Amino acid sequence: MITSCQIRAARALINWSARELAEKSKVGVATVRRMELANGIPSSNAQTLDLIIKTLEKAGIEFIGTPDDKPGVRLK
């Protein structure tokens, strides 16, 4: 699992807009924005969250930590 802050930070690292992430993940822009506004772990279905994670990892993002212990992101 990842947090909403990790999604925002990952987008910032690779300089993607919410629209770009949505298009590349094949989800709606509203879905990305809703996930990023959540507190902690986004409350979306697991499949949608998995699409976001895989898209960001394919773009070179590595998710580190856990939602409860120093969550972060870095470039691979």
What are the functions of these language-model segments?
Residues 46-63:
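DNA major-groove recognition helix of helix-turn-helix/homeodomain DNA-binding modules
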Residues 27-44:
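Recognition helix of helix-turn-helix/homeodomain-like DNA-binding domains
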Residues 1-2:
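A detector for short, charged/polar N-terminal pre-domain segments
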Residues 17, 22, 28, 72-76:
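Accessory recognition modules or surfaces
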Residues 10, 24, 35:
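Residues in the recognition helix of alpha-helical DNA-binding motifs
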